[in-house]
């Protein structure tokens, strides 16, 4: 039984990686389940045993990346000296390092930013992406709340605006890097952008409640 469960998990992982490669090559809307099954070297029936549809597969892939990031955050928290605000900085720096060095993270975010077509056909996939993005907004809000409590940030910080500012900065940097054909050195640029962003969160009056 244990061997069967292990084999099933390996097959599921193999299917997710096949989906990642196919989505990366063709985009989500133009990829069929049959193409994913062929890329994985399994029957369509075997794919359906693990995933109900393409949206279910994308959701599992999204969750896999989120779990990886969560594990890295936990490791950063264990390794870093200081509170959640310091950990947040380390987490962001490590995220952009992985974006360049980890093939799975690179391809997934490339799909998310460039190949996740906003069409009626793709509505369910877009809804899944928004669901996960909402979860990360909540996590960022929690980081800001703790930073305020620890006096790393001002007690009159406008957290709603701050979350929008953070997401806009980070998403904008990722999109710009991908859409420009990686025309600038992300390894040099990301730490500077993160530093500017965090300095503004700590000091800029426009991020305080009116």
UniProtKB/Swiss-Prot annotation:
SUPFAM superfamilies: Homeodomain-like, Tetracyclin repressor-like, C-terminal domain. Residues 32-51 bind DNA. It holds the Pfam family TetR_C_2. The keyword tRNA processing does not apply. It comes from the Bacteria. InterPro entries: DNA-bd_HTH_TetR-type_CS, Homeodomain-like_sf, HTH-type_Tx_Regulator, HTH_TetR, Tet_transcr_reg_TetR-rel_C_sf, Tscrpt_reg_MAATS_C. GO terms for molecular function: DNA binding. Disruption phenotype: Deletion of the gene results in increased resistance to antibiotics and detergents. This is HTH-type transcriptional regulator MtrR. It comes from Neisseria gonorrhoeae.
